[in-house]
From Swiss-Prot:
The keyword Zinc does not apply. It comes from Xanthomonas axonopodis pv. citri (strain 306). The gene is nuoC. It is a peripheral membrane protein. This is NADH-quinone oxidoreductase subunit C. GO terms for molecular function: NADH dehydrogenase (ubiquinone) activity; NADH:ubiquinone reductase (non-electrogenic) activity; quinone binding. NDH-1 is composed of 14 different subunits. Subunits NuoB, C, D, E, F, and G constitute the peripheral sector of the complex. It catalyses: a quinone + NADH + 5 H(+)(in) = a quinol + NAD(+) + 4 H(+)(out).
Length: 250
């Protein structure tokens, strides 16, 4: 599998020479990283020239707080979770907290990505029996924008709408870019790392008004249910070595 992936990597590097593209082989998989300006043209070439006729999934990623943990597990501790945990995300212990890039004592912080928001597409070539992951970072985290690929793979329509709804990533050229999962009038994007875990409003039925009303959240206190933990694990060693195996097409 690794030999096949390496050969495929060489083909990608040769085809996209001159483009801002990085090719990596984590866990025997092939990941193609492309600049936002080259996103649409690269996807079109992958379909028409390399036979990736199927896009099986597309999602957004928010890297805010990437590499930070909330519970030091580097050494054995006599402290339980309630005494040892450190909240570093929005709405974990108090409102207004912002995700941190710090790590617990004894843990090495992971390398931060290039930008906060990214779009990741999973492609399949049935004729070549090959899978490919394509990643693109949005250049502006205030208003993340990448080109829509609905004209290349029409089935991506709802995937892009979902990424827009949950992460606020704008897909330029999408024929019908509107929310798909959240309620009418929803404020914010719930999969962003700086979105409160319990939301901004709560719903209840008002007996006097005889209808459902939305009010600011007051009945729920912020708390950590499951801590975010980063451990040394052999399953992730190849991911950590991804940078060393990466190459940039020239």
């Amino acid at each position: 599998m690794a030999e096949q992936a390496s050969s495929f990597t060489d083909r990608l590097a040769a085809r996209f020479a001159g483009a801002q593209i990085a090719v990596a082989l984590p866990r025997g998989e092939v990941t193609l990283e492309v600049a936002a300006a080259d996103w649409h043209a690269t996807c079109l070439a992958l379909r028409d020239e390399l036979g990736f006729e199927q896009l099986s999934d597309l999602c957004g990623v928010d890297y805010l707080g990437y590499g930070s943990d909330e519970w030091d597990t580097a050494d054995v501790s006599s402290q339980g979770f309630s005494r040892g945990v450190e909240g570093k995300a929005v709405g974990r212990f108090a409102w207004g907290e912002f995700p941190s890039q710090e790590s617990s004592a004894g843990a090495q912080p992971q390398q931060l990505p290039k930008q906060r928001f990214a779009v990741v597409a999973q492609l399949i070539s049935y004729q070549h029996n090959q899978r490919l992951r394509v990643r693109c970072y949005a250049p502006d985290e205030q208003v993340p924008v990448v080109a829509s690929v609905t004209d290349i793979w029409p089935g991506v329509n709802w995937f892009e709408r979902e990424a827009f709804d949950l992460f606020g990533i704008v897909f330029d050229g999408h024929p019908d870019l509107r929310r798909i999962l959240t309620d009418y009038g929803f404020v914010g994007h719930p999969f962003r790392k700086d979105f409160p875990l319990i939301g901004n409003v709560e719903v209840r039925y008002d007996d006097e008004r005889k209808r459902v009303v939305y009010e600011p959240v007051t009945s729920v206190e912020p708390r950590v249910g499951v801590p975010r933990v980063i451990r040394d694990d052999a399953r992730y060693e190849t991911a950590a070595g991804e940078v060393g195996k990466s190459e940039t097409a020239k």
